[in-house]
């Protein structure tokens, strides 16, 4: 087939009368033409409308039926309109139903289930049953919502719906979070288990090294035996090949046979050489070398011109047998097979040329003999068949090209179809996911399925609320009620005990009394009782005797001790008060007394308050947690049935997973919620007195009245402080030597896994760690922050800071605009992060030089720090001033003298050199000699470890470290105070001079003072740097008239752009805001005199211009964004500002001017006519309302245009649905008619 033949690019077939070929794009060659059916099918797979190669858009023309009328009948339009309206009504009704179910019905159900759980817990308890009156419940936390309407029931419904929505959101968030945390925990738990198994495996390997060595020796012996067997097999193969070569000598030349024998001999060398080498040769290397060096039979004679193909099938079959024998040696050593067979066109060309060569370079000729016939040349038939061979070769080449092209086309079609199938499957998955979401929401699918989903969700959430809140609350309520009952009713318990004792006493002593009373009536015993004067006692009943005894004890015992009892009570009360007053000076005692008061208030006022319910629910969770831990610690099963044991095992696994999730949630909540709140409260306490109205009483009142807002503010302050502290620690890590902060975990450590650590470590260890961190943060905040603030407050110079929001200093938000610009310039010019890092690096290195800690802290060892000069009292100043290399440049005499006066002291430390070293108790800082021998203990040499290094440590090492921290803190505190005091004092003076009648505002004062100092300092620094680098002289040498003119033109361009961007455009945008928005609203609500503030409009215009700029330049593919990029690409040499002005700024400015001027001009021209129509409207009112009227008319015009477009599309859709027959593809460059009929197409 010729290259010019027209075939389809997809199906590779020619055109037909019923299926012609088209060239719809710019592509040429074999992919120029395509069938319309193939193209439509491909476009359906790819979801594209243009060619992927030339990006040309495919053009189709719609083909309509012959019976299509010119205009659609009105009845059809009405039916379609009714059908469309019906579908829209059904759809919007369904939307309203789903909206009602999701936002009203389900939240109300959840709210009632929530209230029902608490009502059951409050009803079926002892304390609640004893209540005779229950106060009516308030609407909840949504009191403002519950007062919207005048109907109480409707207000209650609205409040319950709002609370239910919040409850729904919280429950959904908790469920999703619990699911994600569970997956996260299980994933990390699996990794932990795998690592533990790996560690156990390593331990087993370490304990069984002898067995591993024996196994290695056995493998080595097997390798040697395999090597010997391989050599025997290859020797046998060589003998058989020599026999075959004798047969080949009859048909080939001796040189070719000798060449083949030499190649085959290389294999024997490769087999013999490894036997002579060491025993650690890999078996894989032997087999690979065997495959790479197998001989190739090349029986070709350059002088011969005729060749007859001869196939050696017998040779191949025998060699395959021996190859199988060689392969049988391999499986136990896992040797990779590398032999392959190539069938490429290059191999075919080698066959035609008369040579049998390797196609891929790594295959054996023995396995390739049956695929590639060996060509043996014949000199006798040299010139007879030369022309025939050339024809055969040419025909063979054509056939190979056709076959190769067909194979390539098949491969390309398969790849194209695979890509299309993959894209179709991915798109179908996305569509299914989207359809599933819509069906779940109720917008698609059967309505019964949606209602079923709602019922299932309501049931699941109700069960969750009952399980997670109701049952713990009821259980905790019962426990708390019983405890409070015992506390409230101690006399009841005593009465119960006394009644039990009384019954027992009556039963025993009364029975004995009656028996003795009977015995007294006997003749013999009556005389004995008369002599003992006991007959009168037994003459009465037991009840009378016991009552007389009780009255006698009370009269003779308690009456005499009343005075002593009253004295004891009086002294106990007075002593208690004195003890409380004496111990109240201690803060710990006051905290305990505060908690005692809170506990007393809780005990006395326990009811159904929110705080009580939270506490009760926590008590219930604690009880269930205790029961669950007790059950998991039980080593035996509760049941003996195997099936029940399986259920019990599953229940245990669920409890373990819940325990892991609860443990992670508790630790995570403490570290990210409770701990920041704790830090925020401490910082708030430290800031008491810094502001004018910030006192302890006010802070406590605010936290009491607004608890949620106060907790959030404390959390925000605390988390910000912790983040800044973490950034500071990260900066210190970059300054000091690696390994100094080994005791602080590095978050960037790849071996640090906080989640796995939470799962591995016990709960008590985690709580101890958090408590230790809390103590450190408490000490740091109180000691380093609170102490400084307290000292500054005692001076009365800076504090209290005056800050107010009413009245505003500026009517226009110029302060916000200035703050944004100044902060941006400050960050760009001053680079605060680099400046802070440089300050701390200088500070730490300077104090390390003073304290001789440079080797340990900074990793820089200096000889002058390893001792001292006895007669020099201020040697630290000498170390600061002098350079470390000064001692090396001294003369020999000076060095000897310095060495003679220098006294070495201190020692060396074996310390970590990385921050990720595992901490070992008592083995991190080991005193050693310079050579690495321990000073104390066994005095052995420490083991070499890349994670440790030797540094110098002076005498009093730990005291010097404490002094380093103390000096750094003092210097940083002084610098911070100066950065606050100096700008604030200067700013207050400038602010009072500029705004004498305005309320004091220290925020503005500090900003004015800071930038009044910093910008001049930066200008001086930049000027010195500019002069030092000699920029002026180099610039003056390059100046000429052309450069000056170019610079002036560029300056004029920038001035024009700045004038437009800073003055013209902001003023126009501010005027549009004022004329179209502000003035109409003021006119409607206030008909007084209105005045335009140009400054305020300019500020508002600047904000609007910035928003417009960021909106149009957010997408880099837009035309405006590309113009801005091109304009400022070469901003200092050749800025392209004119295209930007021509295409963007001038049209935009003209549109703004027209929007400002045209309504006023129209009002001026049409005022006589308008005044006759609206005689009551004044001229001023018309001018004020004309701009919004123009805006409304423009909006109506846009809506009308949109309505016309929608109507046209709708009628076109009806036409397509009723009369469309098909489409016809157009060739590239043809003008496509709008539509054709079916007869015209034919």
Swiss-Prot record:
The modification Phosphoserine is found at residue 253. It is a multi-pass membrane protein. InterPro entries: MARCHF6-like_C (IPR056521), Znf_RING-CH (IPR011016), Znf_RING/FYVE/PHD (IPR013083). Zn(2+) 1 binds at residues 8, 11, 35, 38. It catalyses: S-ubiquitinyl-[E2 ubiquitin-conjugating enzyme]-L-cysteine + [acceptor protein]-L-lysine = [E2 ubiquitin-conjugating enzyme]-L-cysteine + N(6)-ubiquitinyl-[acceptor protein]-L-lysine. CDD domains: RING_CH-C4HC3_MARCH6. Keywords: Endoplasmic reticulum, Membrane, Metal-binding, Phosphoprotein, Transferase, Transmembrane, Transmembrane helix, Ubl conjugation pathway, Zinc, Zinc-finger. One of its GO terms (cellular component) is endoplasmic reticulum membrane. Pfam families: MARCHF6_C (PF23113), RINGv (PF12906). Residues 1-89, 187-453, 517-578, 634-663, 732-771, 828-961, 1024-1054, 1111-1143, 1201-1242 are cytoplasmic. It is found in: Endoplasmic reticulum membrane. Pathway: Protein modification; protein ubiquitination. Residues 111-165, 475-495, 600-612, 685-710, 793-806, 983-1002, 1076-1089, 1165-1179 are lumenal. A zinc finger (RING-CH-type) spans 1-61. The chain crosses the membrane at residues 90-110, 166-186, 454-474, 496-516, 579-599, 613-633, 664-684, 711-731, 772-792, 807-827, 962-982, 1003-1023, 1055-1075, 1090-1110, 1144-1164, 1180-1200. The keyword Ribosomal protein does not apply. Its EC number is 2.3.2.27. One of its GO terms (biological process) is protein ubiquitination. Zn(2+) 2 binds at residues 25, 27, 51, 54. E3 ubiquitin-protein ligase which accepts ubiquitin specifically from endoplasmic reticulum-associated E2 ligases, and transfers it to substrates promoting their degradation. Mediates the degradation of a broad range of substrates, including endoplasmic reticulum membrane proteins (ERQC), soluble nuclear proteins and soluble cytoplasmic proteins (CytoQC). Component of the doa10 ubiquitin ligase complex, which is part of the ERAD-C pathway responsible for the rapid degradation of membrane proteins with misfolded cytoplasmic domains. Belongs to the DOA10/MARCH6 family. The RING-CH-type zinc finger domain is required for E3 ligase activity. This is ERAD-associated E3 ubiquitin-protein ligase doa10. It comes from Schizosaccharomyces pombe (strain 972 / ATCC 24843). The gene is doa10.
């Amino acid at each position: 087939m010729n290259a010019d033949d027209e075939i389809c690019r997809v199906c590779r077939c020619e055109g037909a009368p019923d299926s012609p070929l088209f060239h719809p794009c710019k592509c040429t060659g074999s992919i120029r033409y395509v069938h319309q059916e193939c193209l439509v099918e491909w476009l359906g797979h790819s979801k594209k409308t243009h060619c992927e190669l030339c990006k040309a858009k495919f053009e189709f023309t719609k083909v309509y039926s012959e019976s299509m009328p010119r205009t659609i009948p009105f009845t059809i339009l009405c039916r379609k309109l009714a059908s469309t309206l019906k579908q829209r009504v059904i759809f919007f009704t369904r939307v309203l139903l789903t909206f009602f179910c999701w936002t009203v019905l389900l939240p109300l159900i959840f709210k009632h289930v929530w209230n029902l759980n608490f009502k059951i817990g409050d009803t079926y308890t002892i304390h609640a049953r004893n209540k005779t009156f229950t106060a009516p419940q308030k609407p909840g936390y949504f009191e403002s919502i519950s007062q919207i309407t005048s109907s109480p029931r409707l207000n209650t419904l609205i409040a319950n719906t709002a609370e239910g929505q919040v409850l729904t959101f919280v429950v959904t968030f908790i469920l999703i979070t619990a699911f994600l945390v569970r997956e996260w925990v299980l994933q990390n738990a699996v990794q932990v288990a795998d690592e533990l198994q790996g560690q156990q495996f390593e331990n087993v390997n370490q304990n069984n090294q002898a067995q591993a060595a024996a196994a290695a020796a056995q493998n080595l012996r097997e390798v040697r035996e395999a090597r010997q067997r391989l050599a025997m097999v290859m020797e046998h193969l060589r003998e058989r090949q020599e026999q075959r070569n004798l047969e080949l000598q009859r048909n080939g030349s001796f040189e070719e046979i000798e060449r083949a024998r030499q190649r085959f001999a290389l294999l024997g060398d490769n087999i013999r050489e490894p036997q002579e080498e060491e025993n650690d040769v890999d078996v894989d290397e032997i087999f690979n070398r065997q495959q790479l060096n197998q001989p190739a039979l090349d029986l070709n004679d350059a002088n011969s011109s005729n060749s007859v193909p001869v196939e050696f099938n017998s040779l191949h079959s025998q060699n395959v047998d021996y190859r199988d024998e060689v392969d049988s040696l391999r499986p136990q050593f896992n040797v990779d097979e590398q032999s392959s067979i190539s069938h490429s066109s290059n191999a075919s060309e080698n066959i035609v040329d008369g040579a049998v060569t390797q196609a891929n370079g790594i295959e054996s000729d023995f396995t390739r003999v049956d695929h590639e016939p060996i060509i043996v040349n014949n000199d006798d038939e040299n010139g007879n068949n030369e022309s025939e061979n050339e024809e055969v070769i040419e025909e063979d080449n054509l056939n190979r090209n056709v076959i190769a092209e067909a194979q390539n086309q098949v491969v390309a079609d398969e790849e194209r179809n695979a890509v299309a199938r993959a894209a179709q499957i991915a798109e179908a998955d996305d569509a299914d996911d989207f359809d599933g979401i819509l069906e779940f929401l109720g917008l698609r699918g059967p309505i019964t399925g949606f209602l079923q989903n709602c019922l299932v969700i309501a049931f699941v959430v109700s069960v969750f609320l009952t399980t997670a809140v109701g049952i713990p609350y009821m259980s905790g309520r019962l426990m708390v009620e019983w405890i409070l009952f015992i506390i409230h009713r101690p006399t009841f318990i005593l009465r119960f005990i006394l009644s039990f004792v009384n019954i027992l006493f009556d039963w025993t002593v009364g029975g004995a009394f009656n028996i003795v009373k009977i015995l007294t009536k006997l003749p013999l015993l009556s005389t004995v009782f008369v002599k003992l004067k006991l007959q009168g006692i037994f003459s009465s009943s037991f009840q009378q005797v016991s009552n007389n005894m009780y009255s006698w004890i009370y009269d003779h015992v308690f009456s005499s001790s009343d005075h002593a009892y009253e004295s004891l009570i009086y002294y106990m009360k007075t002593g208690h008060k004195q003890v409380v007053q004496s111990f109240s000076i201690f803060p710990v005692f006051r905290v305990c007394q505060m908690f005692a008061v809170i506990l007393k208030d809780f005990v006395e006022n326990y009811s159904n308050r929110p705080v009580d319910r939270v506490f009760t629910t926590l008590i219930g969770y604690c009880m269930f947690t205790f029961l669950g831990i007790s059950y998991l610690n039980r080593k035996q099963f509760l049941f003996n049935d195997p099936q029940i044991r399986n259920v019990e095992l599953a229940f245990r696994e669920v409890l373990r997973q819940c325990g892991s999730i609860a443990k992670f949630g508790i630790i995570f909540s403490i570290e990210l919620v409770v701990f920041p709140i704790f830090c925020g409260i401490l910082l708030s306490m430290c800031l008491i007195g810094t502001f004018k109205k910030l006192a302890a009483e006010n802070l406590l009142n605010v936290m009491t009245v607004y608890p949620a807002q106060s907790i959030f503010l404390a959390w925000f302050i605390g988390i910000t402080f912790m983040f800044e502290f973490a950034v500071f620690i990260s900066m210190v890590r970059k300054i000091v030597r690696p390994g100094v902060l080994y005791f602080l975990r590095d978050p960037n450590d790849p071996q640090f896994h906080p989640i796995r650590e939470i799962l591995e470590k016990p709960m008590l260890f985690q709580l101890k760690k958090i408590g230790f961190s809390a103590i450190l943060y408490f000490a740091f905040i109180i000691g380093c922050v609170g102490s400084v603030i307290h000292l500054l407050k005692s001076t009365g110079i800076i504090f209290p800071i005056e800050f107010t929001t009413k009245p505003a200093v500026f009517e226009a938000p110029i302060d916000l605009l200035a703050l944004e610009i100044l902060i941006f310039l400050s960050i760009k010019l001053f680079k605060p992060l680099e400046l802070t890092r440089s300050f701390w690096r200088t500070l730490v290195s300077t104090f390390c030089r003073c304290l001789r800690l440079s080797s340990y802290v900074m990793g820089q060892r200096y000889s002058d720090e390893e001792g001292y000069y006895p007669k020099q009292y201020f040697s630290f100043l000498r170390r600061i001033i002098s350079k470390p290399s000064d001692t090396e440049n001294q003369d020999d005499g000076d060095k000897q003298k310095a060495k003679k006066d220098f006294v070495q002291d201190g020692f060396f430390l074996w310390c970590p050199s990385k921050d990720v070293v595992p901490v070992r108790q008592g083995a991190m800082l080991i005193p050693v000699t310079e050579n690495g021998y321990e000073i104390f203990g066994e005095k052995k040499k420490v083991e070499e470890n890349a994670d440790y290094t030797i540094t110098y440590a002076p005498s009093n090492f730990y005291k010097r470290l404490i002094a380093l921290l103390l000096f750094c803190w003092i210097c940083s505190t002084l610098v911070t105070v100066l950065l606050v005091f100096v700008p604030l004092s200067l700013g207050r003076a400038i602010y009072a001079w500029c705004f004498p009648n305005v309320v004091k505002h220290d925020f503005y004062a500090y900003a004015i003072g800071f930038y009044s100092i910093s910008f001049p300092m930066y200008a001086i620094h930049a000027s010195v740097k500019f002069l030092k680098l000699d920029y002026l002289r180099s610039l003056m040498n390059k100046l000429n008239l052309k450069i000056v003119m170019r610079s002036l033109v560029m300056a004029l361009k920038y001035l024009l752009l700045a004038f437009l961007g800073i003055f013209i455009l902001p003023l126009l945008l501010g005027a549009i805001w004022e004329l179209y928005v502000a003035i109409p609203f003021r006119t409607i609500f206030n008909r007084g005199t209105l005045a335009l503030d140009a400054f305020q409009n300019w500020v508002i215009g600047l904000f609007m211009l910035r928003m417009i700029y960021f909106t149009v330049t957010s997408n880099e593919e837009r035309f405006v964004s590309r113009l801005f990029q091109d304009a400022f690409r070469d901003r200092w040499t050749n800025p392209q500002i004119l295209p930007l002005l021509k295409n963007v700024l001038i049209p935009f400015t003209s549109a703004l001017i027209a929007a400002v001027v045209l309504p006023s001009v129209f009002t001026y021209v049409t005022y006589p006519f308008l005044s006759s129509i609206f005689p009551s409207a004044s001229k001023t009112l018309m001018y004020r309302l004309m701009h919004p009227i123009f805006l409304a008319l423009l909006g109506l015009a846009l809506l009308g245009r949109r309505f016309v477009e929608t109507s046209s599309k709708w009628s076109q859709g009806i036409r397509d649905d009723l009369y469309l027959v098909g489409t016809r593809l157009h060739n590239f460059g043809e003008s496509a008619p709008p539509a054709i009929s079916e007869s015209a197409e034919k």
